[in-house]
């Protein structure tokens, strides 16, 4: 019995010593961690101070966010739009041709020829309306620039596909049942150029486009015209090329030949020789 008490006493003393030593070790570990954290913070602060000093020496100050100034609103929007050029690319798009494929069949040429006079008449009517609306006192000789977009030999453009491409090129269905590219100024629409069916009678019936097909279309503009004729023609050429690319067709000149750089220069020469409105 005496031996058991002695063993329990000895065990208690050993336990107390172990707990004491563990407490001392834990306290030292905590102090070491606190010291390390403080040392790290001091080091980081020192690095930040050095970086700020370097920035000051280099002349780099605090970053400031500048608010964009609100745009000035023109009092006379019509005057601004009148002098504003129609957006277009500075260079003509590269025209893609397939010289191994015939442009249009002979029968298509016969149909196309029947509409040449009608196109001229439509163009004259449109320019006459525009002249009466905007420049009633100016009487000048009318000239017409024409581009054709034709399907490859023995092929036709389907009506639905053609209509989608025409609308994608920002044409709108309007007067004389053909499409027009408009410039809108203060609620007033001005025709820049127009698009008609290449074959007789030249107009479109939107209700029958699903069952309609054609070997090609004609895009035309009159001279003199509103604004800058050269910019209008660039836009017309880009529209013709876009439709041709989407439909797999060809861009032809007014003689229904493959358009060439020389022909484009002839068009531009005609534009330069025409007085402005």
From Swiss-Prot:
Transmembrane segments: 6-26
SMART domains attached to this UniProt entry: ZipA_C (SM00771)
Membrane topology: Single-pass type I membrane protein
Keyword Cell inner membrane (UniProt): yes
Cytoplasmic side stretches: 27-277
Subcellular location: Cell inner membrane
Disordered: annotated segments: 120-139
GO biological process: division septum assembly; FtsZ-dependent cytokinesis
Any GO CC annotation of this UniProt entry: plasma membrane
Record keywords, A-Z: Cell cycle, Cell division, Cell inner membrane, Cell membrane, Membrane, Transmembrane, Transmembrane helix
Annotated Pfam families: ZipA_C (PF04354)
InterPro entries for this protein: Cell_div_ZipA, ZipA_FtsZ-bd_C, ZipA_FtsZ-bd_C_sf
Segments on the Periplasmic side according to the record's topology features: 1-5
Origin: domain of life: Bacteria
Subunit organization: Interacts with FtsZ via their C-terminal domains.
Role played: Essential cell division protein that stabilizes the FtsZ protofilaments by cross-linking them and that serves as a cytoplasmic membrane anchor for the Z ring. Also required for the recruitment to the septal ring of downstream cell division proteins.
HAMAP family: ZipA
Annotated family: Belongs to the ZipA family.
Stated name of the protein: Cell division protein ZipA
Lineage of the organism: Bacteria, Pseudomonadati, Pseudomonadota, Gammaproteobacteria, Enterobacterales
């Amino acid at each position: 019995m005496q031996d058991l008490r002695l063993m329990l006493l000895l065990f208690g003393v050993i336990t107390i010593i172990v707990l004491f030593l563990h407490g001392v070790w834990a306290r030292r570990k905590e102090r070491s961690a606190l010291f390390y954290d403080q040392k790290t913070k001091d080091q980081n602060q020192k690095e930040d101070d050095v970086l700020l000093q370097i920035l000051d020496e280099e002349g780099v100050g605090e970053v400031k966010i500048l608010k964009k100034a609100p745009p000035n609103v023109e009092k006379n929007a019509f005057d601004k739009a009148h002098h504003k050029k129609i957006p277009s690319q500075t260079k003509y798009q590269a025209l893609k041709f397939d010289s191994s494929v015939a442009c249009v069949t002979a029968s298509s040429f016969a149909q196309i020829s029947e509409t040449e006079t009608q196109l001229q008449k439509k163009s004259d009517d449109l320019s006459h309306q525009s002249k009466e609306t905007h420049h009633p006192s100016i009487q000048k000789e009318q000239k017409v620039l024409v581009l054709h977009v034709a399907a490859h030999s023995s092929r036709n453009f389907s009506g639905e596909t053609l209509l989608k491409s025409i609308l994608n090129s920002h044409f709108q269905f309007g007067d004389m049942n053909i499409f027009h590219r408009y410039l809108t100024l203060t609620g007033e629409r001005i025709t820049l150029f127009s698009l008609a069916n290449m074959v007789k009678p030249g107009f479109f019936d939107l209700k029958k486009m699903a069952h309609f097909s054609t070997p090609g279309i004609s895009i035309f503009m009159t001279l003199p015209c509103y604004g800058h004729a050269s910019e209008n023609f660039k836009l017309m050429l880009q529209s013709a090329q876009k439709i041709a690319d989407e439909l797999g067709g060809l861009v032809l000149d007014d003689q229904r030949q493959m358009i060439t750089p020389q022909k484009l220069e002839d068009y531009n020469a005609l534009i330069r020789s025409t007085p402005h409105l």
